Amino acid sequence: MRFSLFVHMERVSDQQTQKQLYDEMIELCQIADRGGMHAIWTGEHHAMNFTIAPNPFLNIADLANKTKHVRLGTGTVVAPFWHPIKLAGEAAMTDIISNGRLDIGIARGAYSFEYERMVPGMDAWSAGQRLREMIPAIKNLWKGDYEHNGEFWQFPKTTSAPQPLQQPNPPIWVAARDPNSHEFAVQNGCNVQVTPLHLGDEEVEKLMGHFNSACEKFQDIERPEIMLLRHTYVADSEEDAQVAANEMNVFYNYFGAWFKNEREINQGLIAPLSDEEIAAHPFYTPEAMRKNNVIGQAQEVIDRLKAYEAMGYDEYSFWIDTGMSFERKKASLERMINEVMPAFSESKVDRRHATISAVY
């Protein structure tokens, strides 16, 4: 099982400048690159300081010049916010800029807050249908001379300009949860990204079950890869692990508030949650965070990840967005590289460079 970093700029208050947040994100990515991680994933969100990511291709183009080895993935682009011709062209250009290091993760999106602003009136079902129309369209645009007459987009014969460096196309990953989305991904030759969010390992097993069932259904198609994304913190003590659980408790309460889309937003920031509101949430308690997320000292984390490897996961993505300070994120990532990844033969870790200051 190989390892990757999943990272964004994240902001719950105006205490940090957005430039500082970006510089810190780049430094985390460079640590991942020097430390032997396989890939970096960064996504797309709009008008939300909670996750600042208006166009992942911009970040990836910058990272291509500031990293040397890692693959660079969109985690994810939101299909209904794009036109197929625009997505195909921007992705192909990014593949060229990155010298063929691009992976493309695609999702239907998750936040009604964004749907209301980007495609008013669209619901999650309709967003999913756009995803299903988008992926075959961009593949054909990369092949060239493709005419499209779909439910959501129509255009005459068109060829993506440019076309990607990787042929026939960069790897495509579908963010999947229910059985139908797994089947769509496998049937269309796409890899799969899954996350249990705040849920425990029962959900991790369930998601792998959906993937295996889809592979069994389409046995004539070569088995794609599957990536597991989890909030992760490698602690230096049990006390440190408990601090991380408390921090993730706060993070998930804000995540849930954004998802519900009922709270006032000012200057891209959600109205602060009170201690009482955070304490009252039944699903995101510190105890649940400590049990469900991958939090613990190195050996505990290794044991959890070995179980995921045994389930059949090809890649584990270290989700570092947690509301923690940059210093705590950095320390956890370095412990992941130096103390956890060497236990996995495919991680190809070069620990000598894991903590060297950024020099690119």
From Swiss-Prot:
Keywords: FAD, Flavoprotein, FMN, Monooxygenase, Oxidoreductase. It comes from the Bacteria. GO terms for molecular function: oxidoreductase activity, acting on paired donors, with incorporation or reduction of molecular oxygen, reduced flavin or flavoprotein as one donor, and incorporation of one atom of oxygen. Belongs to the bacterial luciferase oxidoreductase family. It is an enzyme of class 1 (oxidoreductase). Pfam families: Bac_luciferase. The gene is tgnB. Homodimer. The trigonelline monooxygenase is composed of a reductase component TgnA and an oxygenase component TgnB. GO terms for cellular component: cytosol. Involved in the degradation of the pyridine ring of trigonelline (TG; N-methylnicotinate) into succinate and methylamine as carbon and nitrogen sources, respectively. Catalyzes the insertion of two oxygens, followed by a ring cleavage of trigonelline to yield (Z)-2-((N-methylformamido)methylene)-5-hydroxybutyrolactone (MFMB). It is able to use reduced FMN or FAD. SUPFAM superfamilies: Bacterial luciferase-like. It catalyses: N-methylnicotinate + FMNH2 + O2 = (Z)-2-((N-methylformamido)methylene)-5-hydroxybutanolactone + FMN + H(+); N-methylnicotinate + FADH2 + O2 = (Z)-2-((N-methylformamido)methylene)-5-hydroxybutanolactone + FAD + H(+). This is Flavin-dependent trigonelline monooxygenase, oxygenase component. Its EC number is 1.14.14.-.
